[in-house]
A protein has these predicted regions:
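Active-site anion/phosphate-binding pocket segments in diverse small-molecule metabolic enzymes
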Residues: 3-9, 13-16, 28, 33, ...
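Active-site-proximal beta-alpha core segment in soluble small-molecule metabolic enzymes
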Residues: 3-14, 24-168
C-alpha cells in the first residue's frame, strides 16, 4: 500500500529560488499537511528563504526551526499551548481574540488582522480603534498588519482592497499580504513606498511548478468479474464483464473524487472508473473487458490537490 510523491529536486528548488526572487521580501507559509510534502520537509527549505515562517495554527509552532520567528496565521482558540517560543507572533482580528490571549496569559507580539472581502477573520475600519486599544490594555505588542484576500478574483481587485487599508493604517508597522502574485506585490510597493509590504506565499511557492512533481499509487491486486456480480463495501452491482483493480490509496491519504465526482486515478493517460468511493487505504477501480488493464505492480497516476494529500513516501530525485 503506497501513495508516492516523486519530486524533481533540483527543478523544484530552482522554482523556489525564482519565486523568492520575484516576490522580494516574503514569508514562506508552511501549514496543514505541508502542501503534500509534510511540514518537517518544508521547514528547512523555508529557513533558506527567510528568517520568518508562517504556520497555520498555534499547534504547528513546534515544527518551526528554533532560530525562526514564527507567525501564526489563525487566531488562537480556547487552548493555548504553554510555553510558546518567545519569537512566536500571534494574530488577532477581534476583541474576542484579544480576550482569549489575555485569559491564556499571552503578553507577546501580535499582528492585527484587517478584514478583506473574504469576510473571514479581521477587523473593519470601524472596529479597528477598539481592537488596537484592547491590544494595548492586554499588554500585547503590535508588530504588524495582515490582509488576506480571497483566492478568487482579479489581481487588480485584490490590490484595490489592500490599497484601501494602506491609505488608513500606520506605516511604521509592516503589512503582510496573501494571495497576491509577485507582480501585484511589487506594484503595491511602488504605489505605497512608505509601507513595508511583505508577501506571505504558500501554494505559489511550494506547488507553483506542477511539472516538478508526480503523485502515484501502485496496483496491489486485480479481480476478474462477470456482469451481474457484486463487489465492494456496498455490494455494488457490476454492469459488464471486466476487472476490479485494487490500488493502494484512499480516503486515509486524503484521496477523493475530483470535480463532478470524477475518478482521480489515471492509467496510460486514461481516467479509470471508480467502482465505489475510495475508502481508507484502498480504492476499488473497474476496467471493462477489452481495455488494457493495469496489473499488480503498475503505477497509477493520482490527480489530487497536494494541499489535502498525505503521501506514504516522498522520492526526491
Amino acid at each position: 500500500m503506497t501513495l508516492r510523491l516523486t519530486v524533481s529536486t533540483e527543478l523544484w528548488r530552482n522554482h523556489l529560488a525564482t519565486t523568492a526572487l520575484a516576490y522580494g521580501e516574503m514569508v514562506p507559509v508552511v501549514k496543514g499537511n505541508g502542501y503534500g510534502f509534510g511540514r518537517a520537509a518544508l521547514m528547512p527549505e523555508a529557513a533558506k528563504i527567510s528568517r520568518t515562517v508562517a504556520v497555520g495554527s498555534v499547534f504547528e509552532v513546534a515544527d518551526a526551526p528554533a532560530a525562526s520567528t514564527t507567525i501564526v496565521l489563525t487566531p488562537v482558540g480556547i487552548d493555548l499551548p504553554q510555553p510558546l517560543p518567545k519569537q512566536t507572533i500571534l494574530t488577532v482580528g477581534s476583541l474576542h481574540h484579544v480576550a482569549t490571549l489575555r485569559s491564556g496569559g499571552w503578553v507577546g507580539p501580535v499582528i492585527i488582522k484587517l478584514q478583506s472581502r473574504m469576510l473571514r477573520y479581521g477587523a473593519t475600519s470601524a472596529e479597528l480603534p477598539d481592537l488596537l486599544a484592547a491590544v494595548r490594555d492586554a499588554g500585547c505588542t503590535q508588530v504588524g498588519w495582515s490582509v488576506h484576500p480571497p483566492l478568487d478574483g482579479a489581481p487588480a481587485q485584490h490590490r484595490d482592497d489592500i490599497s484601501q487599508w494602506l491609505a488608513q493604517i500606520d506605516a511604521s508597522f509592516p503589512i503582510y499580504v496573501s494571495h497576491l502574485d509577485a507582480e501585484s506585490v511589487q506594484q503595491l510597493r511602488s504605489d505605497f513606498k512608505q509601507h513595508r509590504i511583505v508577501a506571505r506565499v504558500g501554494t505559489a511557492l511550494w506547488l507553483g511548478d506542477k511539472s516538478t512533481m508526480q503523485l502515484h499509487t501502485d496496483v496491489l491486486d486485480t479481480r476478474t468479474v462477470k456482469a451481474g456480480a457484486t463487489a465492494g463495501y456496498r455490494n455494488t452491482k457490476i454492469s459488464t464483464d471486466g476487472t476490479i483493480v485494487l490500488v493502494g490509496a484512499g480516503s486515509a491519504h486524503g484521496v477523493h473524487t475530483v470535480g463532478d465526482d470524477l475518478s482521480p486515478f489515471h492509467f496510460q493517460r486514461q481516467r479509470l472508473r471508480l467502482l465505489e468511493p475510495s475508502h481508507m487505504h484502498t480504492s476499488m477501480l473497474f476496467m471493462p473487458a477489452g481495455e488494457t488493464c493495469a496489473q499488480p505492480g503498475d503505477l497509477v497516476d493520482v490527480q489530487q490537490p497536494l494541499t489535502r494529500v498525505v503521501a506514504d513516501t516522498i522520492y526526491w530525485t
